[in-house]
Amino acid sequence: MRKKFFFFALCLAQSLLFPLHVSSIRPSQFCYPPADLKELKILSWNIYMLPHLDFKNSNKLRAAAIAKELNRSDYSIIVFQEAFDKNARNIIREVLHENFPFFYGPVNNSSWYSTQTSSGLWIASRIPLNEIHSIRFDIASGFDRFANKGAILLEGEWHKQAFQLVATHIQSDDYGWEIREQQIREIHNKLLLPFSREGIPQIICGDFNTDHAETEHYNKMLTVMGAEDGNLTGMEKYSFSSDDNEITKGLNEKPRLIDYILLRNSHAIESISRKIAVIKNNWGLNHRSLSDHNAIEATIAFSM
């Protein structure tokens, strides 16, 4: 994990990032979702787009391939992590904006002269969302100190059922659990708890850098937030793996599940199905892996 921020640290001063932005909207786009589309489908994906001087990972080529795949998807909302690269965001936005007219972020943006960058959190949506509140974590370590990591809470409606969406990216797991635990507590104390409303589900998604196999830390994460997880459908069970991934090949890291879509106040949710989404496309000679992470998706049916 430490290697992924090597170029990040070198490029911070030259990284130009957009402020919170919502694209222009055509009246016809307010017709979404159609009456027969009952389920809300959310994708959360760490796309590994470090600042634009990170030539090693061919951000522009990967961004074009990512955009092509997502543009033909049926996701309602896409939550990106590590969308640091302005040029990559421009490419993705240009392709997606017809089907995903609403963009939010990058969250915790910095001025052009800052030594820090944004949180890398960026949201594309087919439906309008209201930004309720965002936070920057009080503590971080290592290269995460150069990123304004934090979380954002947005609120939307799906067939008149209100829901809240929290997006986050927690401290890299190269450093102690204590930092991640404090950041998770900040999400609970500053977003989940104060903005909780009766009958409004809270959907919490992102890269938590907390391995499902580390039972003590995983259970603590859920307990602190008062959140629920669930089983994954499908064959793939890991969101980070060096198996069959050219970007992480050679790292020799064990496969891990560290990305989640969690629920809180879930009484209005009839069902949820979670799945690891392995999204690939050709972007260069012998290159199909689009990120060092697999994505995670959730299909949510509300009680109507």
Identify the function of each model-found stretch.
Residues 2-95, 110-118, 299-304:
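N-terminal, active-site-proximal structural segment of metallo-dependent hydrolase catalytic domains
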Residues 25-34, 59, 77, 81-170, ...:
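Structured beta-strand-rich core segments of catalytic domains in phosphoester-bond hydrolases
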Residues 40-47, 66-92, 124, 154, ...:
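Active-site beta-strand/loop signature of hydrolases that rely on acidic residues for catalysis
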Residues 47-50, 85-86, 110, 127-130, ...:
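Short, solvent-exposed loop/turn segments at secondary-structure junctions
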Residues 55, 98, 115, 177-178, ...:
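Short, well-ordered secondary-structure micro-motifs
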Residues 38-41, 117-120, 148-152, 161, ...:
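Residues that flank catalytic or metal-binding motifs in active/ligand-binding sites
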Residues 57-58, 64, 176-192:
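Alpha-helical scaffold elements lining the catalytic groove of polysaccharide deacetylases
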Residues 18-32, 192-202, 210-304:
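Metal-dependent phosphoester-hydrolase catalytic domains
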